[in-house]
Amino acid sequence: MKKLNLRQLKEHLYHGSLQDLDFSNLTSSAKAWLEREIKRIEEMKFYEKKLYEEGLNFIAGVDEAGRGPLVGPVVAACVILPKEIFIPEINDSKKLPEEKREKLAEVIKKEAISYGIGIVDCREIDEINILNATLKAMKKAIFEVKEKIEYLLVDAISIPDMPIKQLPIVKGDSKSISIAAASILAKVERDRIMREYHKLYPQYNFAKNKGYGTKEHIEALKKYGPCPIHRRTYVEKILKG
């Protein structure tokens, strides 16, 4: 039987599992990569494993996408993963190319015990500010989850008035597999929304810039003015300057 190379191994892992994998049927480079990946992902389970050892089962990661853009909503996700989950190449969404994020999002949705998405639009961001909008989106995502969450691992910030115990982790999307999964779902959902907005307002090229303040986007903003989904509190300074 011909041994699986690295590309074939990754495809197998996306659609199968470690349990049904014959390690002797891997090329040396594929086996070396897999050993490194297993070690990396086990390190990303550090916080989850500590909580499992305390007898908890439903641990959720929470993260957001869209605090920085000039346009559109802030999107949060909340994800509970199984204890023995192995998703190759899962990481902070910002470290992954778009195509990889899309593929990983499909796997996460399929393998997750439960997940939720929360969205707060640009109008509300202008009304309550981006931090409060982010917290509101996170709460929405948490309450969308079907299982009873026992503990929250949150990227960087603490969520006030939350009846569930939580731990904010700085750069949590790189340190916790649950937060990484949430970061990917939030980013993929927000990118999908921005592609839809691009169809309505193609002059700003939202499909490419996703609403961030690129040079091209700012030039279009100055040329055409803001559209209905621009965050007024963000673009006023740019237009005045």
Swiss-Prot record:
Example GO BP: DNA replication, removal of RNA primer
Name of a matching Pfam family: RNase_HII
InterPro entries given in the database record: RNase_HII, RNase_HII/HIII, RNase_HII/HIII_dom, RNaseH-like_sf, RNaseH_sf
One Gene Ontology term of the molecular function aspect: RNA binding
Matching CDD domains: RNase_HII_bacteria_HII_like
Similarity-based family: Belongs to the RNase HII family.
Protein name (record): Ribonuclease HII
Source organism of the structure: Caldanaerobacter subterraneus subsp. tengcongensis (strain DSM 15242 / JCM 11007 / NBRC 100824 / MB4) (Thermoanaerobacter tengcongensis)
